[in-house]
């Protein structure tokens, strides 16, 4: 018997030739022979990308060489980097130059192996090389197979947009080998499905239906692992590809050069390409087209040429392939780092579309699934496009007079959701008509499908949904059911998933939603189900989603008690699932009168339609008996229109005096809201005609609506928003009650109406269960809002205010336009088409958007835990002081409430157990009542109580902050041994700590490890490291913003094995840097405890933000590449300790990157990639994948390559420039190696630097910050500035020595000069010079110069003198910068005093007193300095009492100034005088009476242990008479004036340059050391 011949490949004809060949296995089994036979040449050039070469080219080469043996032909190969970035003029030129170097001629055949990028660009090379050579397409992606490889369009991208330079150049062959799809990444496969969906949507509804039905199976196979993953869908894929390719071939054959018909293939592309042009390369072509299809379908619906059901069907199909349907899709936002697509830019991009007719934009409009409105793209005006693209809409008031319209609202949301649940639980097929096509029902439909509860298909152009129910046979889902903000779906499905049986992959199902859903209540339903044996676990906030529901296989049944006063949906949820319980159910509603009884009645009525009859108890109120059974699906179920939605068109009629008819809602409706016309509109003055099945309303003349003294809207609570906007324009007061449940809907709707109506000048009062609206009908009417109406992402708020906008005096902006999609996606279309309302899209100000998107600062209260003696109370007080919050020590609060001490409580009858119970009760109380704006210090043993631990863990998980305070255990032990104020430990202290250590860890999400001992420092003075920590964790740090605004910024990379051993180096090496990098991978000990200590020490020493880096071996570091668990533990530590920056390598596993980025709090992620081997080039697209990945996860992107030559640095600069033009995310990009030094000089933003004092450099070619500044100066990138000292006499001043020394040390090219003058006119020209960098000012110009500056600091204003001039901000058009006058004398004094141990005084009765000697200009600075340290009173000792009194009068009373002029005044001085500052000249004798007064005060015996310090402001002679008096008195430390000169100049340098040098260097320069 003859062997059956295997069928050959499928051939598709295009332009009269069968040149498209489709099959599995073509590449190695067919292509070589076919090429040699049908496309012979002397030279084949195979061009592919670096990703594909190794997999597909070597085997092909071997086959080719074997087949071509003896023939005069050769095969050349060339690779380019993958990705859209390669589709450029530069890459095209690179290929052409290479081909010329290979002596390719006119007979060359080019083979493009790859995706759309490869085919587009290589086709263009073929079209222009030697004026056109033959080429062959071998598409390897689904998108290329069905779209870009067919039709001869070739092009490259330009900065203006995609594919704008190219040619029509038909390939000689297109080999579509479906085997390539086996290795195609999941995202690329899904990307291609967009073009498949597009082709079916414009051409063939039958194929579209196949796509709908195949989506789940296709995705399951595509996402599976292993060889042969696509085998189960082999035939489906072949059908899809042949179908799509065939359509395109047919269209191209009819219209090769895109004269009209071929336009249709661009459905979704007009808007999609514009989106792609902005979001490329992070967003793929198919993803952009998917979004474009949705928008263009919405456009067709808005224009009235496409029915809403078709739009919903298209959106559902696109989403079913996991493609995005909106630019706000979470994945799109993440991939593109939230990059905006401004409407004006989108329209500009659309303006260069090749389909356009001059200025007229042409867009493909669908008229149905599988059919287009015209056989070409249609002209659409910009105003309409803008409306569809904009996030907000501007509604112009007014409708035509005598309007009489009929409006059919979408299907009822309430009935639609119930029908879907009942049909899915029922057995058999059910045709559901008039189903609401909305976000809510889409979530419900997707969830039921995910649970395997039913299959479904669309009929009658998407107007009928056919549900095939499986009789309640549901399976638990491994993937969470995401329900957005669909409250109805969440409540119904909570009970439905309890009916699930365990599946192979899951024994429970998680229900989750968006942020609002996670605060909406569901507690009563969960309580009822738990009481009936269903295991449900809250995954986040108690009483809200997300929930984990056990696959219980049904309820136990019997009696179920349910609180139904919040939502009737809880009742309906249990009612609908009850027939599948293991026993008959009696549902008893408790807690008071059930809310929204009509909706409960609706559910019972619908259950009867599906074959299950519920009976109300005859002897118990609010009790129902539900039998066991199985729903039997009716063959057809028609959903009546949504009565809540119907209130909006009826209200427009009411408010405008026109007529509107709703043809399918009348008095026999199942819905309570159907009564709105009769119960609300009629009493307000409307004419209402309601039959059994229709409602017609005619409004009174505009302005004649009457308010309702009282209306109970409990039967129709959702309609209260519509009533409220009508009440706003009515005369008199309207009181609406019975709507308490509206506070827990999509938003607090009562508060929302009150706040938004206020924008129209309407006053409202909130009631316990309602709202009171004071109508403006008799007061001249409502006023027009000056700002947009905020809709809270709530469909009913948006639609209600669109009604009011029609009656506004001027246009009204309604924000969040798309939120109406929840129940009436086509609402704006109805306003435009039926009511003829004029509207246009509106885009909020971009800056306002940016403000909204900023991460919020910490608002939730902080609970501090840790061992007694760790410093919780001290840290709590510090934190409260910094944040302006209230501090409460819970131990003290417990004692206050109990009226006895803790030791007394423990010794009492209830003992430790009673104490712990009261402690727990207090914790619960403050968590509930004081969840914001408080700092609580908890008792050390609180964590011993399991329930307390759970409370703390839950609090931390739900956005709260639990801070663990710890310090060296030995210090804690030593302190506790001395503390007698608390109960003694019954077990050894260390054992207690070790027992609690893990508890502290698990309960806290923040950690502060104090490097300060209990005895060190002032408890009133907040240490710098703690300030830095709180600033970071609270979101108040502006460091990133500050360094982004600087021209040049740096972080120094520490390369020390132990920070504590290098403690003396740290202050020196951080000079000139903006942050310090802790290379954790270089530490000797990387244990969590050790790293905790190292971070703590570094923060205290460096006083700079920390970059926490764990560099792996493969990225040039020392951390093991695959030590993932150890690495994750260290990353978690970094986040707990509030590291300002955490470096995360983009080569780490996805789960680690996700974990770190999602729990980062306010830490900034530096998403990094290093190429220490130098395998990648900045010239091509090889860095793009790493850039894109870093963009997804990073606040900062860091890319580091290797330079082989200087050219590599220029290539890098071009790459960086292109990326920064496209994205705002800041970027560090450099090359390693000697040749890469230039890139470090040019980087500018947070450049990693070394320091000569460090043991070695962190990377090859690393430079110091000073070296880079010198390099910048040589390149002309850092302009030299001139700084001056103004005054007279100044020839002996040490200021030039100070500043020029510091300029030299920090690498700055500036010079500091003396300008000796006593005339202010001499300095004016200098102050205006473009190269003026700053000035020091001394006598006699400190007052005169105040008139020459633009603004004064608070210190300069208070002191009344300027000693420092600082240019601020950017130069204006005349190259002049604004000048700030400041005074650093006081800061110099404070520094000198602090250096001698003077601490900030606690704000208490015990704070120290201080004295200033003298009454001149310097005295004022001394007073300011002492006040800043908290001293009070401050005495002024001077010989002239009148001058003293005048001086004191210039300062606020809070300074507590008191004058002393006679020796007898010494008796007025308090005994705790600890600080004296002398401001009198030292080169002349002291006034005798003043000397006697000062001598008497200095000679007093010391009180307490505080240090006594005398600061002498004069520095000639070196030992002054006042200093001599102090020496003679004894017990005084004297500080000479040169110390102040050094420190005030040190502060000046910091103000001018932003660099804080070492004080010892400034001091040495002044003292000439």
UniProtKB/Swiss-Prot annotation:
InterPro entries documented for this protein: 3-dehydroquinate_DH_AS, Aldolase_TIM, Aminoacid_DH-like_N_sf, DHQ_synth_AroB, DHQS/DOIS_N, DHQS_C, DHquinase_I, Enolpyruvate_Tfrase_dom
Example GO BP: amino acid biosynthetic process
Annotated stretches, region: Shikimate dehydrogenase: 1280-1569
Entry keyword Transmembrane: no
Region (3-dehydroquinate synthase): 1-382
Cofactor(s) needed by this chain: Zn(2+)
Residues engaged in binding 7-phospho-2-dehydro-3-deoxy-D-arabino-heptonate: 131, 147, 153, 163, 195-198, 248, 262-266, 269, 285, 354
The keyword Cytoplasm appears for this protein: yes
E.C. numbers: 4.2.3.4, 2.5.1.19, 2.7.1.71, 4.2.1.10
Gene Ontology CC terms: cytoplasm
Chain sites annotated for binding ATP: 866-873
Keywords: Amino-acid biosynthesis, Aromatic amino acid biosynthesis, ATP-binding, Cytoplasm, Kinase, Lyase, Metal-binding, Multifunctional enzyme, NADP, Nucleotide-binding, Oxidoreductase, Transferase, Zinc
Bound cofactor: record note: Binds 2 Zn(2+) ions per subunit.
Binding positions for NAD(+) per the UniProt entry: 49-51, 84-87, 115-117, 120, 140-141, 162, 180-183, 191
GO molecular function annotation: 3-dehydroquinate dehydratase activity; 3-dehydroquinate synthase activity; 3-phosphoshikimate 1-carboxyvinyltransferase activity; ATP binding; metal ion binding; shikimate 3-dehydrogenase (NADP+) activity; shikimate kinase activity
Residues the entry annotates as binding Zn(2+): 195, 269, 285
Region (Shikimate kinase): 859-1053
Catalysed conversion reaction: 7-phospho-2-dehydro-3-deoxy-D-arabino-heptonate = 3-dehydroquinate + phosphate; 3-dehydroquinate = 3-dehydroshikimate + H2O; shikimate + NADP(+) = 3-dehydroshikimate + NADPH + H(+); shikimate + ATP = 3-phosphoshikimate + ADP + H(+)
Region described as 3-dehydroquinase: 1054-1267
NCBIfam families named among the record's database cross-references: aroA, aroB, aroD, Shik-DH-AROM
Function of the molecule: The AROM polypeptide catalyzes 5 consecutive enzymatic reactions in prechorismate polyaromatic amino acid biosynthesis.
Family note: In the N-terminal section; belongs to the sugar phosphate cyclases superfamily. Dehydroquinate synthase family. In the 2nd section; belongs to the EPSP synthase family.
Protein name: Pentafunctional AROM polypeptide
High-level lineage: Eukaryota, Fungi, Dikarya, Ascomycota, Pezizomycotina
